Amino acid sequence: LKVAARLLALTMNMHALRFLPVLAATIITPAFIHAEIAVKSGEKIAFLGDSITAGGWGNPAGYVRLVSAGLEANGVHAEPIPAGISGHKSDQMLARLDKDVLSKKPQWMTLSCGVNDVWHGPRGVPLDEAMAKSGTYDEKVASRGTYKKNITAIIDQATAAGVKPVMLTATVIQENLASKENGLLAPYNAFLRQLAKEKNIPMADLYAMFEKRIKAENKPTVKVLTSDGVHMNGEGNKLMAIGVLKAFGLNEAELDKAKASWPALEVAAVEFAKKQAEARAKAAAEKAKGTPAPKKK
């Protein structure tokens, strides 16, 4: 009888063991381990940046619009605060931080900065003091500070004001990844990654995402993500938006919902581009009809 009881117990235990993988899968499934979307309905998100960010709002299918639509598709009704200005560098963003961002009292701020700091060459912003003394920059370089100090100040001031920053690495300067400009940009992005880690700031490593996509496409003569090597085309805007949404905590299923909301914006973007082209053609025609201004004696 005792032997029979032991055999029965062993059989039951072995039967239970068969269900352990199912139980484990249930416990560690992504639905259980995935954190909630960090942004909540009613919160404001400031998008601080340069022309890439300005276009990200001005274009109906720009990355700022796509991020907003993607959150909406997942039930998060956040208010975007566009704060991108064409040509701006880190010193200019720092100078207008209070007016364009902090005064609006957002809960979040994405920071996209670095392309112009490098791309503007002698008029750019050096990474650090050593670079400032390299002889590369014009006589006004001291007034622009350094990228490291400017970015750190932006993050610290935002945090002190209760704003949660999200760091975006600067996107490519030319889709030729071996370009001189991309080489110069590399230490700037390395600094951003380091600072985000030190301050425990969410990050969208957009440069790494762009690099991976450009290499995968392997089309040296085709602009894959940009219209001119710097500013985004439709695919570039979508990739930027995906990076930002991931930084906000969206999982793959939530990203799929976000992407499903984008085609309507892309249709609007086509119409927007058409109207812009018509306006440019009209302006050019009017200019051609006009008489040149008289030369000064």
Residue spans of the language-model regions?
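A structural signal for the hydrophobic beta-strands that form the central parallel beta-sheet
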Residues: F47-L48, P82, M167, T226
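Catalytic nucleophile-elbow at a beta strand-turn-alpha helix junction centered on a G-D-S/GDSL motif
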Residues: E43-G58, K89, V118
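Bacterial N-terminal signal peptides that target proteins for export
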Residues: L1-P21
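Bacterial N-terminal signal peptides
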Residues: R18-A31
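Alpha-helical cap/lid subdomain in secreted, periplasmic
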Residues: M14, V39-S41, A61, R65-H77, ...
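Short beta->alpha junction loops
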Residues: P82-K89
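Boundary at the C-terminal end of the N-terminal hydrophobic targeting segment
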Residues: I33-A35
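Short, histidine-centered active-site or binding-site loop motifs used for metal coordination
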Residues: G49-I52, G84, T171-V172
